[in-house]
Amino acid sequence: MKRSLGSNSSNNSGSGSNKKSKKNNNPSNQKTLGAAWGAASSRSSFRSSPFSDFGSYMEVKNRKLQNQFETEASAASRGVSGSEKLIFQGVSIFVDGFTIPSHQELKGYMMKYGGRFENYFSRRSVTHIICSNLPDSKVKNLRTFSRGLPVVKPTWIVDSISANRLLGWVPYQLDQLNDTQPKLSAFFAPRSHLTPQMASPVTSFQPDTGYSEAEEGSSIRADDSEEARDHIDDEIDGVYIENTTPELTEQTGTGDLKSSEMNAEGLGNYDIEEKEVSSELQSTTNLHSTSDNKSVHANGKNGGKSIATAAGSSTRRHSTLEDPNFVENYFKNSRLHFIGTWRNRYRKRFHGSSNGLKWADSGQNTAEMAKKSTIIHIDLDCFFVSVVIKNRLELHDKPVAVCHSDNPKGTAEISSANYPARAYGVKAGMFVRHAKDLCPQLVIVPYNFEAYEEVADQFYDILHRHCRKVQALSCDEAFLDVSDLSDVETEVLASTIRNEILETTGCSASAGIGGTMLMARLATRVAKPAGQLYISAEKVEEFLDQLPVGTLPGVGSVLKEKLVKQNIQTCGQLRLISKDSLQKDFGVKTGEMLWSYSRGLDLRSVTAVQESKSIGAEVNWGVRFRDQQDVFILVQHFLQCLCKEVSLRLQGCEMIGRTFTLKIKKRKKDAEEPTKYMGCGDCDNLSRSITVPAATDDIEVLQRISKKLFGSFCLDVKEVRGVGLQVSKLDSADPSNKGSRTLKSWLSSAPAVVQIEQDDNVFAAKVRENSDCNRPVTGGVSRLRESNSEESSIQSGDTNSSLPPMCYLDMEVLENLPPELLSELDGTYGGKLFELIEKKRGKRRINCNSPHVSLDGTAASIKELKSLSVKIHGLSTSGEKEYKEPYVPHPSIARTSNQHTIEMTDLLPSSLSQVDVSVLQELPEELRADVLGAFPSHRRQQSSSDVPKETCKKQDEEPIDLKGTENEIGLSFSSLWFGNPPLWTEKFKVSGNCTMEKLSAIYFKVAQSRPMLSLVLQHAISEMSSFPDAASASDLDKAIYDVCELLKQYINLKVGGDIEEIYLCFRLLKRLAARSQLFLQVYEILSPFIQASISEHYGGSLSIP
């Protein structure tokens, strides 16, 4: 009977009769969640099975799996002690999706420690759902998905095993409010998506930049004041810490906190700190990093493994991946950036308040001055905390710290802590989670940069009222040289200043007084908080005897360890070592420093704020790029924003620079993820520099240089973790002569610009009246300017006042000058030079195309001459981006000109292959565009002599937009790809060249709907078995030129957004070059051009195998 039910005939006969009844009975047969998949099946295979329906099959399967699990669990638990067997008793988990630990590992844990593992979800048997990430559909319907069960991360299992007890699942629940699933639109977003509107709003808690002070350049002083403070004061408030700069840390730390690129690569299964990310990222547009490699390595490598919860918002929105304003926000919310910008404001505000800030007497010995000097060191106590809580009396006696996040399990870093917090061991640079462990009642407050700025200004107003010699170290710390204030007691003055600061700002300050800057600062350390200490010269040795060597400026952890190995722990012990021994063991400079500081000697004097030796900016937090496609959009946008920031800093300091250094942090091979969220981690530091002839702060120059340097690294952008740009070899930028030192300004300068007079006859007559060379021209062109004030406007300068008389000029030299230079000289002489030349020639008439003017000075010739002068100088004088090229005669016309005619085309190369690309790249953009624009005109004139003169003039007069077409070449062929079909197809069709006609026909055949040149070239290879050469050399030259123009314009159209198309075209062109002499020459001519275009746009070269 069973065989007959399973036969084919039985299947066919019974399948149709029971279809409707089975559909009606489906819902009543469902017994598990998975039963719905197959309960409605009408296939006869289920009718022939021992199960009544799919639901019964699943019920039996689940029972079998549970039996297998219990058997394996019994065997696995034999080696486990009794106390460990029942950790997960009563817990039944269902694993959804990819997790770490894996599905099988979690199953093993349940077997070993008394839990149950469900292969199929059932609300009746499952107690916890384990997952790391959820798709968008489940996030939106979380209640439906979980059926009210807790959804927790797998770290709950791991941590419970580590603790040998069942931990509460609440801290580990997956509270994923937004999906992390990439959107399809993100992969096809145009360049226009990089708009400021995409930036997230900044709310109350602001991030800290924490970029390296050494890299800051313009913001942070280059001397050792920060380093000294770092090692002198163990209770420092985090303002100048080099090794623990705030907010992001750790280039060597590891952990399992996932960074954004891991999610982007589909590895987002690590246990990212959800509440930390939600707290730190939702409250700000971005976070910031330090650039030091050692700041939190001591915090442990696995500190983040027990942290659970997932990001409340997409982490990529707070990195370079999707935040177009990332760089701007990075520095906007930076504490160190605030200090740097404040220093610039201070320099401008108090400039000249202390006699130009130059106090040292150059005729007096520095050592002699140090002996009789008295220095006060003033430092506000816990500045960044005190300013925030000064109006919050309830927090004055409580432990408080400044940070961007108060998440107790976060990796945000403490920037500054008050003294009650420091009593618990809380220090600057410490993770919030570690600080909360030491001090659970720690109160976290956000930054208030406006209040900081106000208090800092009040602080320095008070200092400058009481002392003339003030050296600002930061917004809250300064040295005062009161050696010349003999009418007031030093200690009384310090006390008066401190009391006035407290009354005005509401913040306490500490003061140290000593004979040197070193002793004053050491005294402040002892006086803190809210006190003052005076160390007289007689008490210096006594004070230093028991002072640990680690508190001396410049003694870091490495140097301190070396000293301890030699049993040198105090300054008293250090004084027993001779200078020669110290210099032998630690080097000349370090040995000199140790010997001097151990005796309280310090030859430094209080001076003004020193000019920065370098200015730059570095970003090494949140830098993540997906793949090579980001090079063309996100990387370039990032570099543009970074160059904008550096340019603004240069302009703020009124400096320009010549050497540009691009620094890259590249993730080390096999480096683990950093403990700090979105940190740079363990990196290799790479850098390359370039020096330009003329100093500049122009943002376009910086962008071009940075793109070129970045391309020279040849990096996988996925490995980039930090980028910095530094400008050195600085020079002062005089605002009144800004731009006068640039090559562009020198080339475009015109001492005289002649305005076209409506009545040219009157102008010509007046020029003839003033062209007499019998009387010397004294006093420059002043009289010329007076006589021609109505007809011409002449820009005078120092050069004009020393011009030689025209009668002293060598006419033979003048006649052989280039037309542009000759026109410029003519303008300098008020338009009289051309007439003088003609008079010397005996009043000979010359062709109107010549750059000279006839003696009788007809209106037409003068008008053309003046038009030429305006065209030559129009770019520099009008300030417009569009200009007209001067008319250059056609070669055929030039041959008929007078022998004195000077053609500009004589100065141009015969082909672009003769141009040095490296030199071309170093030219300013306007000059480079001018050179590239002139070259095709020259080629066109040589190869198309049959073009009418009127056509040439019309084409030459068409303006070129330098801004819109940065690499635009050709003056009259810019429309070959205009229209549908493009104009070149008609031109090629009637060219008379077989190859060109065939290309036109192929376009209409295959590419009319998709105007892609690669389609035309691809079909040309397959359809054209042979390529007949032109009948004559001139025809071949003309065809080569026309095809070159077609490809050049196509490159200009595509190079900015479709480099793949250009690559494909030149691969195909190289194949065509093997078959045709025409395409071979085209390929050789265009190869340097394409490489120059690629280098200009992307900073590299295009490899064409």
Curated annotation (Swiss-Prot):
Region (Disordered): 1-50, 198-263, 276-319, 775-803, 934-959
Annotated organism of origin: Arabidopsis thaliana (Mouse-ear cress)
Family label: Belongs to the DNA polymerase type-Y family.
Residues annotated for dCTP binding in this entry: R335, D379, L380, D381, C382, F383, S416, A417, N418, Y419, P420, A421, R422, D476
EC number annotated for this UniProt entry: 2.7.7.-
Protein's name according to its UniProt entry: DNA repair protein REV1
InterPro entries referenced in this protein's UniProt entry, alphabetically: BRCT_dom (IPR001357), BRCT_dom_sf (IPR036420), DNA/RNA_pol_sf (IPR043502), DNA_pol_Y-fam_lit_finger_sf (IPR036775), DNA_pol_Y-fam_little_finger (IPR017961), IMS_HHH_1 (IPR053848), REV1 (IPR012112), Rev_trsase/Diguanyl_cyclase (IPR043128)
UniProt keyword Phosphoprotein, yes or no: no
GO biological process, one term: error-prone translesion synthesis
BRCT domain sequence ranges: 83-174
Cofactor: binding comment: Mn(2+) ions. Can also use Mg(2+) ions with a lower efficiency.
Cell compartments where the protein resides: Nucleus
Positions of the UniProt region annotated as Protein interaction domain: 1021-1103
Entry note about domains: The C-terminal domain is necessary for protein interactions.
Disruption phenotype: Reduced UV light- and gamma ray-induced mutation frequency. Slightly sensitive to ultraviolet-B (UV-B) and DNA cross-linkers (e.g. mitomycin C MMC and cisplatin). Lower germination rate.
Assembly notes: Monomer.
Cofactor: Mn(2+); Mg(2+)
Motif (Nuclear localization signal): 953-961
Any single Gene Ontology cellular-component annotation: nucleus
Compositional bias annotation for Basic and acidic residues: 947-959
Region: Interaction with target DNA, residue numbers: 330-340, 556-559, 612-620
Site entry (Interaction with target DNA), positions: K676
Entry keyword set: DNA damage, DNA repair, DNA synthesis, DNA-binding, Magnesium, Manganese, Metal-binding, Nucleotidyltransferase, Nucleus, Transferase
